[in-house]
A protein has these predicted regions:
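Hydrophobic h-region of N-terminal signal peptides that target proteins for export
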Residues: 8-17
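Sec-dependent signal peptide recognition
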Residues: 1-9
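Metal-dependent phosphoester/phosphodiester hydrolase catalytic core
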Residues: 18-426
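Selective for proline/serine-rich intrinsically disordered segments
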Residues: 12, 61, 67, 140, ...
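C-terminal outer-membrane/trafficking sorting elements
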Residues: 430-515
């Protein structure tokens, strides 16, 4: 009898381990890493992810981590050492037993380094994870989902964390086809009001600390900069995504705190100085007038921000907004709220919502298609953004899609394409590890280098668009960050080749006529 009991345990235990992952999703995607959150049916200190790329001859394993009741049994897993531009599948190992059932098996594709083409889907205001809009988005085969808020409509506002956890557990990660979409598509996500602390919620709401805790437990996210707020940034290809949190520090006097505003401007300057187009995610509508629940409620703050961006020469921006339940596109002609109103730069706007909710209009003028509110609560709407990058011009297409309530049709509602030529084009790794060679174009200052440890000298060679040698210099290498001034250059495209010992970095940059 004892032998029979032992045999039964050997049969039952592996099945129990295979079923121990109850929900999961991925996010914080980069060329070499991804974060995964997995909720287990019980506590363990031995859970990890195993991933492979075709032909799957060897697997990459994450470090072991824990699923603890203090974090609602959610394990925070980071998978590193991935290859850029590769499709991966992953599965879980719990307590030494690998899940071979396929029930808990996810997938993602890493982006490439440097100039790269890709696509993503975007939207806000998700009324139901059972809506066919989730399958329609999956059919677009996006690199990731950019969620601009209201991922659920539970409106939690409690000093207790459980009411803020439950919507992730029950509404976001448990319903089909949403959960299958999230198994196959990484997410980048910033909250709005309904998934923060309820309709119209701001910094005064009592549940903000609980919302922050539940978000950090459940959501695979990029690095945070504040104990409560969830503003974050990341770069894919030559697009730098900047996600503003317009709820946790919002007051009757300001949309965002001074600390978040400083962070936002530093991220804009990072994009400007590193040859990137900035994709600014503002969950609330930017270009409305007279509405209390978006940027129209703080016209002075909006004008001041616009003035600073113009003054800093941050010209390559496009804006993605949610909250209003409608599809709409503007080429930037209606996005200028600067004091001078001189339309110095065009900042195109893509208003993409609602994933599954009835329609609404919250202001704004749009000259490239719209406004198109959801015709009914049964209709789903989302945005698709195509990024085409040939290494010089970067062209972006906004496609607005609408589905019916049964998934029979998914039709194109509006579309708009624009192109930009950022001031610098990186070829190779934009974010190498500390100690590696990195170079970027700093405008009138010249070229900036991060010099590898122990380097003795550097050789700089610059050619113009015809291949004519413009500059060749050799100089002693300083430690850390060093500046290499350039001679006055005619406006045009240039290629810089920098050698430092055995390392080489190549970048292309555009010198403007003001140098």
């Amino acid at each position: 009898m004892r032998l029979l009991h032992t045999a039964l345990l050997l049969i039952v235990l592996p099945c129990s381990a295979q079923e121990s992952v109850t929900s999961y999703w991925s996010g914080a995607l980069s060329p070499t890493s991804i974060h995964i959150r997995a909720r287990l049916s019980g506590p363990t200190d031995s859970v990890r992810v195993l991933a492979c790329a075709p032909p799957c001859t060897e697997e990459i394993a994450s470090p072991y981590t824990v699923a603890d009741p203090s974090a609602d049994l959610v394990a925070a897993i980071e998978l590193t050492g991935l290859q850029p531009g590769m499709p991966y599948t992953y599965r879980f190992e719990v307590n030494g037993v690998q899940d071979a059932s396929g029930i808990a098996a996810g997938s993602f594709t890493t982006p490439g380094f440097g100039a790269a083409s890709f696509s993503f889907v975007t939207g806000s205001c998700n009324g139901s994870g059972s809506h066919p809009v989730w399958q329609a988005m999956r059919d677009k085969d996006p690199l990731f989902l950019l969620s601009t808020g209201d991922l659920h409509y539970r409106d939690p506002n409690s000093v207790e964390v459980e009411p803020h956890r439950e919507p992730y557990r029950e509404d976001v990660l448990s319903l089909s086809p949403m959960k299958e979409f999230l198994h196959a598509t990484p997410i980048a996500y910033v909250w709005d009001d309904h998934d923060f602390c309820g309709n119209g919620s701001d910094a005064s709401f009592i549940g903000k600390a609980s919302a922050a805790r539940a978000y950090r437990e459940y959501v695979p996210h990029y690095p945070m900069h504040h104990p409560i707020s969830v503003y974050q940034s990341f770069t894919i290809g030559r697009v730098h995504f900047i996600l503003s949190d317009l709820r946790s520090t919002k007051t009757g006097e300001e949309m965002m705190s001074g600390a978040q505003l400083s962070w936002l401007l530093s991220e804009m300057l990072y994009a400007r100085d590193n040859g990137l187009v900035a994709a600014w995610v503002t969950s609330l509508t930017w270009n409305s007038v007279g509405y209390p629940e978006n940027w129209a409620c703080q016209p002075a703050e909006r004008s001041a921000l616009n003035d600073v961006l113009f003054a800093l020469g941050v010209k390559d921006i496009f804006i993605i907004a949610g909250d209003a339940h409608m599809l709409a596109i503007d080429d930037g002609a209606n996005a200028d709220f600067s004091t001078a109103q001189d339309l110095r730069y065009h900042y195109p706007i893509f208003q993409a919502a609602a994933l599954a909710r009835w329609g609404s209009y919250k202001g704004g003028q749009f000259n490239q298609g719209g406004v198109f509110p959801n015709p009914s609560a049964a209709h789903g709407q989302f945005g698709e953004v195509l990024v085409e990058d040939n290494g010089f011009d970067l062209c972006i297409t906004f496609n607005g899609w609408q589905t019916d309530g049964v998934g029979a049709e998914c039709g194109l509602v509006n579309s708009y394409t624009f192109c930009r030529t950022p001031g610098q084009i990186l070829v190779g790794m934009p974010h190498p590890a500390n100690g590696d060679l990195l170079c970027w174009y700093a405008g009138e200052q010249g070229l900036m280098f991060r010099v590898p440890d122990g380097a003795a000298s550097m050789e700089v060679e610059i050619t113009d668009a015809t291949g004519r040698l413009v500059l060749r210099e050799r100089r002693a290498a300083d430690h850390g960050i060093m500046l290499h001034p350039l001679p006055r250059l005619s406006a045009g495209l240039y290629t810089a080749s920098i050698r430092c010992g055995s390392e080489r970095s190549v970048l292309r940059f555009v010198a403007d006529s003001h140098r």
